[in-house]
Amino acid sequence: MAFAEHEVLIPRDAMDVYSFLIDGMNLPQWRTGIRSISLASGPAQTKGAVYRQTVAGRAGLTVAADFEITEARPGAEIRFQTIAGQTRPSGGYYLSTEPAGTRVRFALDYQPKGLLGLMNTGIQRAMKAEVVQLERLKDVLAVRSAA
């Protein structure tokens, strides 16, 4: 099993943060490695929405990493499941209101099967690198609030 999480405090209202995160089209603004993203099916920004995404893989290859929003609780939680690609983690953004803004926790969980289980250390490292990008979200939203 591989698990990674990271959290930041963003000086913005929980609904502002939620509205930005629920829109999959915003991912390239704060997550590196996303080559393309589009809404594949379902209503945008809601439970059931499926986003077609390609990301940078090893050796410069482009890898499918489509995902579906599996839970959407406005101002509180967004969960998703990766549905394409070799590794298919589930994850979520968990928001809580604090006096100084919104605390956001980004968590990823992956249960490797078969031979992928032998690569657990590499998968764990890659997942940690993904969740730490939450620091970039904080910067992006700070700039947006100043504009």
Where are these regions (language model features)?
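Amphipathic alpha-helical segments that line or abut small-molecule/effector binding pockets
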Residues: 15-18, 131, 135
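Hydrophobic ligand-binding cavity/cleft-lining segments
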Residues: 1-40, 46, 147
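Beta-strand/loop substructures that line and gate deep hydrophobic ligand-binding cavities in soluble
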Residues: 81-132, 139
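Glycine-rich portal/gate segments that line the openings of hydrophobic small-molecule binding cavities
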Residues: 38-84, 132-147
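Hydrophobic beta-strand positions in extracellular immunoglobulin-like domains
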Residues: 10, 55, 108-110
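Intrinsic-disorder/low-complexity, polar/charged segments enriched in Ser/Thr/Lys/Arg/Asp/Glu/Gln
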Residues: 2-7, 15, 50, 62-64, ...
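Hydrophobic/aromatic beta-strand elements that line small-molecule binding cavities or substrate pockets
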Residues: 6-8, 39, 65-71, 82, ...
